[in-house]
Amino acid sequence: MQLFQNILVSIALLTQIVFAIEITENKVDRGTVTLNLSDITIYPGASWSIIDNAYTSFVGKLDVRDGAGLYISSTSHLLALQVSLTALLHSITNNGVVSFDSRISRTSSSYDLRGVSFTNNGEMYFAASGEFSSPTALTSASWTNTGLLSFYQNQRTSGTVSLGMPLGSITNTGQVCLNNQVYEQTTQIKGSGCFTANGDSTIYISNVLLAVSPKQNFYLTDKGSSMIVQAVSTTQTFNVYGFGEGNKIGLTIPLMGNLWNSAYAYDTTSGILTLRNLLLEQKFNIGTGYDPSKFQVVTDSGSGIPSTILGSVAYYGRVPERTLPKSCQIPCKPIPEAPGTTPTQYTTTITKTNTAGNTVTESGVVNVSTDKGGSWFTTTSMFPALSTAPSTATVFSSDTIMSTVEPDTTELASLTDIPIETSSVEELLSVMSNWEISSAPTLSIETPVSSHHSSMQHSSFESSADINTVFSSESAFETASDYIVSTPSSISHSTMVPQSSVSALSVVSESLASAEPSFVVPSESFIFSASSAAPQPSSSTYSVSFTTQFETPSSAGPSLVTSVESNTELISSATQSSDIQTEFTSTWTTTNSDGSVVTESGIISQSGTSLTTLTTFQPATSLVVPPYSVIETEFTSTWTTTNSDSSVATESGVVSQSDTLLTTVTTFPPAPSAIVPEFTSPWKINTSIESSETLTVSASSYETVGESLAAATSSYLSSATVVVAPSESEINTSSSILNNEEIASAPVSDTTSIAEHHDGSLSMTTTEFVNSNSLPSSHSIVTATITSCNKSKCSESVVTYVSSVSCATITVGDSEKNISTVGNNVSSIVGDDVSNTQAITMATSTEGATTLTSVSGAKPSVANDATNSVHTTDYTTATTGVQNGSSLSIPSDIPIEISVITPTNSSSSAITIPYENGSNKESIENIKYLALVVFGLMMFM
């Protein structure tokens, strides 16, 4: 008995050795493939793709190494895959990629892999269309998954996925992805892996008596996914992630509460959801953060599972945030594309020996595609075979006339010997049919097309023969691995005409022996044409010319002609060619004289072993710009300029460029700079009157108070606006005081200059001349806020004036009492252009106070009449009264733009207070004192 077992084991081992299949490089098989009793091993870096093999049965073990791949796929709508491994004594081990893909088929597919063990450490994909039930079973006794298992259907059917031997156990520490599939548990589940339900998928725990590890995880990713657990007395707790958005968790029987508990309960503290039917219950750890009001009892009626009415619970709300286990974070990848499932084209090369004993290399293009029914077919187009036998040259001992041409980018090896032995056309034509060319042409990749024209003319008194030989060279490289690219070498083209009545044409390549090509592109074709009259055996004159023409437009090679004549007889040998002519397109590359590589294509004519370039296509994409073409562009630029004062300024704008000519189109205005250079700017002060109303200030009555006169005044005012424009740098004014038509003070003339500083501020320098004495002073132009109050209402206005103090505020109040000004006399100011003295009037009126606005630069015309009235055509500026004969009081500040009194029709008594902000002539204390006086007078009256 032991001997018999040893014999069986030996036979089995020998069988495995004999029939083992080892894949060490990429391989594609289409159609029926017989695996026999073979162990299959696919090594790293290699793949085996089996396409449209309806039944694939693995009899031996299957071992896919790391970095290797096994692909079994269907490309036919009518052909579904049936893949099985039925040898119970063999194993399946995958460390690479295994893919079974039958998604395109409209019939039922089946995947049934059995064996003594199943181990997946890589990626395995099982895909079906799902139009019919397509079961998948991986039912090995020893079952382990640490990688990715993906079960995919285009749509869900009643087919299920079974893992492991029923009633056995599986160990899952990886990821099991379900897409429109149903996983039915029939074993114990060990490990800390993950089952992920995508799309319309269901995880069905059909036998709770077989324990599921508490570390195993179940992930519901879509609203259509669900989980169903058998309801038995044995209660387990399942880790569920992604519960929400309407997906379901349920039991195999309807949910029903009892006297103590409801049909379902959620513990917000522990995150446990309990589903029960009377006394049977199962628990699900869904996590915390759920709203108990959003749970609802529903029915899960998916295919492939027991349809239980009101046996599940759905949560109609967002899934609370919860960290996924690492195994659930392994992505569910899409089904990979199998090599060779799309139409393809490749080249092939065959080397053989012909009947003459010469080595012949054939090359062709293989097209693999499918017909309308999805069936694969292959077409092969072979190029003609060329001999690689070395060529020999004929050496003439007689005197010869030599002409040599050495092109730079052409490498052509051919040998043609034409001995001249006859002078008749008939003999010439008969000899032409026996021409042989012993050559091994080698074409450099640098020159795709070169043609050589050789003409021989036979002429006599009444007979003539024209023989034209044209042979061209072209390359049609499909892939670099199929062709040998020779290096350039020196080529000598020799035309030899011996004096001993023998003429020969030979083209010799010095690098032919060293090239040793394994494949030579068909490169020569000969076209002969002959015409003759009646032949006569008289002596003839032959003209032999050799022409090298470079037909590629990008080639810079010359066109050289070498011609010799001799009174000799012609004997020639010609090549034999096939009568079958074909045309096809091809692509080649050339190298120009400047080293650039150009790709060209065209139509090639093939007659036997002869190839001729008929047409060269124009480049599909080429842009040739003339070297001196003028292109006009516009762009933004920045530049620096040097002013006449040697200062450098930076400017920017739009520049137009035409060839090398630059033209400034637009100059942008300079941006405001943080640093403004200090300079003196001219200003012009204009005065415009907004009202045509005449301003009058009159002295209506007088009374003696001691030695003084008291005057009551009435004011009729109109507003004015000052416009300041940079036109004059100096403002000249003059003024004097008249009393009873006599000058009360010396004439005063002013010269005022305004300057703008780098910080944006303005300043004014004033020089006053009193009796030819200059009194210069410098002031700053500042802004003050004037607050005007009328009864209980107040308003503010901003005025600009000249002062040595940066800012000041004065408040004008109102009163119901009239005031009188006491003085020796009412003095006034006259002047041509008075702008150096101004006052702010504090008025009292029973109807309201005056309002301050902005004005400056008045030109009053003042005169005293018999009633001592003061008249003006513009408006009157009142100042502090001075005694007769006293000098003009010169204010310290020269207002440029200060308050103006808005016209009012009421009669009022006013006291004028010169408003000189920062002046040492009138202090704030004096203003307060006068305000108290005014208040006292108001109380007195």
Curated annotation (Swiss-Prot):
- Which N-terminal residues, if any, form the signal peptide? 1-20
* A cellular-component GO term for this protein: extracellular region
Q: How does it sit in the membrane?
A: Lipid-anchor; GPI-anchor
Q: Where does the source fall among the domains of life?
A: Eukaryota
Q: Where in the cell is it found?
A: Secreted, Cell wall; Membrane
Key words, A-Z:
Cell wall, Glycoprotein, GPI-anchor, Lipoprotein, Membrane, Secreted, Signal, Virulence
User: Can you give the propeptide residue ranges?
Assistant: 918-941
Residues linked to a lipid group, GPI-anchor amidated asparagine type:
N917
Question: For this protein, what post-translational modification is recorded in UniProt?
Answer: The GPI-anchor is attached to the protein in the endoplasmic reticulum and serves to target the protein to the cell surface. There, the glucosamine-inositol phospholipid moiety is cleaved off and the GPI-modified mannoprotein is covalently attached via its lipidless GPI glycan remnant to the 1,6-beta-glucan of the outer cell wall layer.
Q: What induces it?
A: Induced in low iron conditions.
Q: Which family does it belong to?
A: Belongs to the HYR1/IFF family.
What is the role of the protein in this entry? Answer: GPI-anchored cell wall protein involved in cell wall organization, hyphal growth, as well as in host-fungal interaction and virulence.
Name assigned to this protein = Cell wall protein IFF9
Can you name the source organism? Candida albicans (strain SC5314 / ATCC MYA-2876)
Lineage start = Eukaryota, Fungi, Dikarya, Ascomycota, Saccharomycotina
Q: Its gene?
A: IFF9
